[in-house]
């Protein structure tokens, strides 16, 4: 029997029987795995807390006929504020859904693992406006997946002047001379462009200090949503819930 030892983040867990739970684990060393915690629904079971959503733990797991099974576990990090705060919980749920969907089973991605862990730690410890954190996380995630939007020059010709449009299909900001090249190019407010660039580049800690007018956030939301749809061909249900809780 082959045993795997790895640190992992619990992205989500569900009931699989009257006594057991199955968890989606994002493991540091083996990617996304489905693992069963036998007896996790029993209050006295050693696995009762082993697959609580968003925890980070060290696991020993083994492969069965249909699933992996948890043999041992040891807690590394528990996010108490996420459990207590609905806004933080909504952001953590968004992180969980996005990572669950962009990752294929058993696809190791160490950079994405540590990005996910860091993002959850930021949600836990910082007090950033919900929509602003969500936008920044999404831009950082899609960039890590290889679709970083060009925001400081024209995505078509490379010029840094007159960036008056945005095109998801062309990959970012577009100058006025190239906008007809991109069929989906839409006018881009300079303040929105500056906001998007800041969200992409700034560390999460810096986001606590900014306040942005609602009209700018609304336009940024439209651009990011369309960009994600174009490049990932996905919408995320948990986003709507998080946005409803935004300040």
From Swiss-Prot:
SUPFAM superfamilies attached to this UniProt entry: ArfGap/RecO-like zinc finger (SSF57863), Nucleic acid-binding proteins (SSF50249)
Signal peptide positions (record): none
Keywords of the record: DNA damage, DNA recombination, DNA repair
GO process annotations (BP): DNA recombination; double-strand break repair
Pfam (any one): RecO_C
InterPro entries found in the cross-reference section: ARFGAP/RecO, DNA_rep/recomb_RecO_N, NA-bd_OB-fold, RecO, RecO_C
Superkingdom of this protein's organism: Bacteria
UniProt keyword Cytoplasm present: no
GO cellular component, one term: bacterial nucleoid
Family matches, as HAMAP family: RecO
Entry's family note: Belongs to the RecO family.
Classification via NCBIfam families: reco
Biological function: Involved in DNA repair and RecF pathway recombination.
The protein's name: DNA repair protein RecO
